Each structure stands twice: as C-alpha cells, then as structure tokens.
From Swiss-Prot:
Gene designation per UniProt: tdh
Cellular-component GO terms for this entry: cytoplasm
Protein name per UniProt: L-threonine 3-dehydrogenase
Assembly description: Homotetramer.
Keyword Zinc appears in the UniProt entry: yes
Subcellular location: Cytoplasm
UniProt-annotated binding residues for NAD(+): 176, 196, 201, 261-263, 286-288
Residues annotated as binding Zn(2+) 1: 38, 63-64
Length: 343
C-alpha cells in the first residue's frame, strides 16, 4: 500500500510503499477513503521545534480521516466489516486518574494517531476498534474525515454554560474557528463576531457571523463594544496569537467566559489580576474531544443538517500530489484540504 511518512528528522514527507497491516486483538483494519491535512501535520512537515520534540520517525502521518472497515481482529464485535467510520485520533489508557474520572480527553497516557503511532495518510491503517465512530453510509467520506477536528469546535462551543442566547466573539478563523462559527449560529447565539487577519478565511465566516473583523484594519475592542454595547459574554479563542488572546479577554464583560483551544507557539505573559481575577472571568482550557459526548453532540448537528461542513472542503487532491496539498494549506489560501489515498 502507499503511505505518506516522516522517514527522517528533517523537513518534508515521503510517499512510500508499505505492507498492508493486519489487525490484532481489539483492532480493526480501515480502508482509508479520505484524509484531511491538519495544522499538526504542517508542524510535522516543517519539522519545527514541537515536531522535533515529539515525533519519532519513521511514522505514517495523518489523524483526520475516514473510511470503510475492511477487517476486524479477534474479539471485535463492533464496528463490523463494511461499516463506514470516522476515527477518534486519541487512544486513551482507561486507567489513569483522568480516565477514571471520565476525562478521557486529557488522558495522561494519550497516544495520537499520526503523531505517536501510524496514522491515516495511507491506503490502509490499523486502529483500536473503540476509536471508530460508525457513520450513516450516505455521509460523504470527505465530511466524515473532518468530524474529528469538528469535535474540537463542538467541545469549545459547548463548554461551560454554552452559547444559546449569548453574545460571542471568535478569535481565529482557521478551520476549527470556522466550524465553531457554524455551531454557534446553529445553537442560537448572537450577536456573533469573528476576527481574523486573513481575508480569505475570514470571508468563509460571513454566513454565520453578524460582524467580521480584520484586526489589522479595525480596532477589535472598539467594534465589539459598538456591536454589543458593552462586551461579549463568551470568547472562543482559536488563534493561539498573543495579541488576539489579550484582546479577546478584554472584550469580555465582567463575569464572562473564555474558552481557549488555540495554543501559542511560545509562552505568553498576561495580567492575571486585570484580565481575569478582578473581572470575574472564567477560563476553560479545551483539549481534544470529550469521549464520547462531543462526538454525539457534533454528529447530531451534522446528521440533522443543522451544520453543513462541506463549504469548508476547499480542495481535493490525490495523495500523489501531497506537496501541492501541503503548500496550499501553508499559504493560508485553503481551509480543509482532502487527500485521496487511492489516487
């Protein structure tokens, strides 16, 4: 089979031939039909400081994908051969304190597909059966491939007291920020403001936002106060940008909620008293997806048609054109780029 792998501790990836793996006890073999490139994959491609500290080549990359169950290992009752599945990328231990208290999404021994073990940029992949989410067979594989990152957006939106009837600011209109805008709109929030300095991506938020803000052209805090009269009740932070984080926190009304998924590339400084404590701000750190509550919430939105993820699928390319695909995503002139492992 063909697979896209990190073979050496250096920039880039390589298209390789590998034997089709066989599922062991509790595992399934998935024939991958669609795979999506994530920002994490870009880090691995660039071989930046994070990748150098985490990735151990050789490794087949990719953790956002969908496909068909081709075979099951001993002891597997579900899913069954022929099922269409999306994959939860976090493999958890079930034994650490986090898992034992139901916080599987922050398992102390998490292994991530395509990061810590072979992932989905391949024609076939073996995964734990428990990591498969069975989809209706009429759900397009391209949409099914991005249910995993969609879960990050769903988790962020529904953390804390939710968003229904609340004013919301979204900082960062990358793929997950845009997905969050869809969920926020479908959940009855308003007014909704979305901020991002990339005009291409910001435009994708137009159907879901009451106000778009390019912070390079307008004062975000001034716009927020003009639209809301005082500030927003909820901040959803996806950018990981230090300036955006500070602006977002100060855009909150006293007593507001900040839900932060964006990860800064370097540690940042902030005024704990002035930005959080004395203003009564509640901050939530969001990691991954709650297992399996987030999957239930997210698929309910997608299966019912309340959220349509297809507008975010901007490019579809064969796996053989992976260099072009990664270049598109790195340029900022794409949202979700889908790879077809069979082509």
């Amino acid at each position: 089979m063909r697979a896209l792998a990190k073979l050496a501790p250096e920039e880039g990836l390589t298209l390789v031939d590998r034997p089709v793996p066989e599922p062991g006890p509790g595992e399934i073999l998935v024939r991958v039909e669609a795979a999506s490139i994530c920002g994490t994959d870009l880090h691995i491609w660039k071989w930046d400081a994070w990748a150098r500290g985490r990735i151990r080549p050789p490794l087949v990359t990719g953790h956002e994908f969908s496909g068909v169950v081709e075979a099951v290992g001993p002891g597997v009752r579900r899913p069954q051969v022929g099922d269409h599945v999306s994959l939860e990328s976090h493999i958890v231990c079930h034994a650490c304190p986090a898992c034992r208290t139901g916080n599987y999404h922050v398992c102390l021994n998490t292994q991530i597909l395509g990061v810590d073990r072979d992932g989905g940029f391949a024609e076939y992949v073996v995964v734990p059966a428990e990591n498969a989410w069975v989809n209706p067979k009429d759900l397009p594989f391209e949409v099914a491939a991005i249910l995993e990152p969609f879960g990050n957006a769903v988790h962020t939106v529904y953390a804390g007291s939710g968003v229904s009837g609340k004013s919301v600011l979204i900082t960062g209109a990358g793929p997950i920020g845009l997905m969050a805008a869809m969920v926020v709109r479908a959940s009855g929030a308003g007014p909704i403001l979305v901020s991002d300095p990339n005009p291409y991506r910001l435009a994708f938020a137009r159907p879901y936002a009451d106000r778009l803000v390019n912070p390079l052209e307008e004062d975000l805090l001034e716009v927020v106060r003009r639209v809301t009269g005082s500030g927003v009740e909820v901040l959803l932070e996806f950018s990981g940008n230090e300036a955006a984080i500070h602006q977002g926190l100060m855009a909150l009304i006293p007593g507001g909620e900040a839900r932060i998924l964006g990860i800064p590339s370097d540690p940042i400084r902030f005024d704990l008293a002035g930005e959080l404590v004395m203003r009564g701000i509640t901050a939530f750190g969001i990691a991954g997806r709650r297992l399996w509550q987030t999957w239930m919430q997210g698929t309910a939105l997608v299966y019912s048609g309340r959220v349509d993820l297809s507008p975010l699928l901007t490019h579809r390319l064969p796996l053989s054109r992976y260099r072009e695909a990664f270049g598109l995503l790195a340029s900022g002139q794409a949202v979700k780029v889908i790879l077809d492992p069979k082509a």
